[in-house]
Amino acid sequence: MTLPGEQHLHKIQFYATTAYSCGYLADKPAQSLIATPHHLIDAHAYSGLIQLGFRRSGKFAYRPHCETCHACIPVRLPVAEFQPSRSQRRAWKQHRNLSVALIELAFSEEHFALYSAYQAARHEGSSEDPETVEQYRNFLVQSNVESLMVEFRENGVLKMVSVVDIVRDGISAVYTFYDTADKHASYGTYNILWLLDWCGSLNLPYLYLGYWIKESRKMAYKQNFLPQEGLIDGEWRPIHTERYAQPK
């Protein structure tokens, strides 16, 4: 199977996975379209794929390919047009004391400990087993594209790690994990604001945030960053006119 689009993708083939349980919408099956062979998915090829709605997990580039559901919408932020809300400006001011370091992808016990604590807090009460070091490595440490880890520290203490990909027209936020112990912190918001600022300093027009699903509260935070574009029917177009209102 091939996809229409950019010329440099002509050597890449695509196959659909078998159905599996959706991780975001309960009781719904899901399928993905996988780009292959993996060694051809370099920074150049991935820059084309991300514009077609693909994302990266380890060495795999994929996008949703569900027969009866089209809830997953790839979203990106036009950097030059971004308008922070009042709460986002507060988050920016609150965490400006964090020191930031860009490092190559590599396994770190310190990173894995923070990741494990983050997963435990986010999936409290879940019957799923904790992720192993191997699963973590496969997910976040392996990449065939231009990827970096962004470390955020406060007085030398690791508070957050953001894994990102650099593509032709922007930065793609792959995954972020942070210290959940401080209930008054806004690390996730600050991470997106910092990445937007970094995009601007590199003259990159877009920050890619992955998929947004209207019915998923886990993804509702993405709607708070405006203006925003979504890939709908093969075309990037403006979506969301209002920020997410937390249900009372």
From Swiss-Prot:
Single Gene Ontology MF annotation: leucyl-tRNA--protein transferase activity
Reactions this protein catalyses: N-terminal L-glutamyl-[protein] + L-leucyl-tRNA(Leu) = N-terminal L-leucyl-L-glutamyl-[protein] + tRNA(Leu) + H(+); N-terminal L-aspartyl-[protein] + L-leucyl-tRNA(Leu) = N-terminal L-leucyl-L-aspartyl-[protein] + tRNA(Leu) + H(+)
InterPro entries: Acyl_CoA_acyltransferase, Asp_Glu_LeuTrfase, N-end_Aminoacyl_Trfase, N-end_Aminoacyl_Trfase_C, N-end_Aminoacyl_Trfase_N
Source organism per UniProt: Methylobacillus flagellatus (strain ATCC 51484 / DSM 6875 / VKM B-1610 / KT)
Location of the protein in the cell: Cytoplasm
UniProt record, GO biological process: ubiquitin-dependent protein catabolic process via the N-end rule pathway
Gene behind the chain: bpt1
EC number: 2.3.2.29
One GO CC term on file: cytoplasm
Name of this chain's protein: Aspartate/glutamate leucyltransferase
Family indicated by similarity: Belongs to the R-transferase family. Bpt subfamily.
